[in-house]
Design a protein with these regions (language model features):
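Active-site-adjacent pocket scaffolds in enzyme catalytic domains
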Residues: 3-17, 123-213
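Generic enzyme active-site microenvironment
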Residues: 32-34, 92, 218, 249
Length: 263
């Protein structure tokens, strides 16, 4: 059954020609955070203060980002979520319960999407979705349509030529897009790198992905603060990013709005 889903995935998506909406001389980047806290499946030690330090760092350089947040985190730490948004960052869904879609039943998937559709979250203007562990499943398509999502995100690893996809009209998702993430911080977990190594790890993506394309770099807040060297390397990367005049940074939602207006 799973192999059937993988075949369907290959047939579902069509590459978008970014065309006149995006300057071919600039690289279009989005920064995203999977905000999971104790619901990540790992032992974590992160506070609201740690999270605020991240958003303040981004704000210092006038960067905005997209935070894909677990619904249970939204319920338990509402002040933290509001604070993230107050700095101009976008809020997206990382499922309600950090559900691994490819390991779940269809009933579990539908129940999770329904739980995330809580009235408590309505004013957060959530339009995007990112599957935990990047384990997306085609069975989520009907939920995308039913709950009004405008984009999703998947780590493709297509470092040099990230592709932005659209969903075909027959799925009631003709105005929905899929963004490509090229790298995240997961490979840094349990490593013993120096801060400059961490900075280089992230910055290599900036040099490789092509102008005229949209690409994402992802982070887990709990992982960033789990090791001082990782944190300092992340800070170094953000500082370096601020010097790159060839890179435009927007939220996923901002890119989606531009793209859906040109499909």
């Amino acid at each position: 059954m799973r192999s059937r889903y993988k075949l369907l995935e290959k047939r579902l998506f069509r590459a978008i020609d970014l065309g006149s909406a995006f300057d071919g001389n600039s690289k279009y980047l989005f920064l995203y955070f999977d905000y999971e806290r104790e619901y990540s499946g790992h032992k974590t030690d992160i506070t609201d203060t740690d999270v605020e330090e991240i958003v303040k760092l981004l704000a210092r350089y006038q960067f905005v980002s997209t935070w894909f947040i677990v619904g249970q985190v939204m319920e338990k730490y509402p002040d933290s979520v509001r604070n993230i948004q107050s700095y101009g960052n976008e809020i997206g869904s990382h499922t309600y319960s950090h559900l691994i879609l490819r390991e779940a039943t269809l009933t579990q998937i539908k129940k999770d999407f329904s739980a995330f559709d809580s009235p408590k979250f309505k004013d957060l203007n959530i339009k995007g979705f990112h599957s935990p562990r990047d384990q997306w499943d085609v069975r989520a398509l009907s939920c995308y349509a039913n709950y009004g999502y405008k984009y999703d995100l998947l780590k493709t690893g297509l470092m040099d030529s990230p592709i932005t996809f659209r969903f075909p009209p027959k799925n009631r998702l003709d105005s929905m897009v899929r963004f490509s993430s090229v790298i995240d911080d997961w490979d840094l977990f349990h490593t013993e790198l120096e801060p400059e190594d961490v900075t280089r790890y992230f910055s290599k993506a900036l040099d490789v992905f092509q102008a005229g394309t949209i690409a994402g770099i992802g982070f887990h807040p709990w992982l960033l603060v789990s090791d001082r060297n990782i944190w300092e390397g992340f800070v170094g990367f953000i500082k370096l990013l601020s010097t790159r005049k060839d890179i435009t940074i927007k939220t996923c939602g901002q890119y989606a709005e531009i793209l859906t207006g040109n499909l």
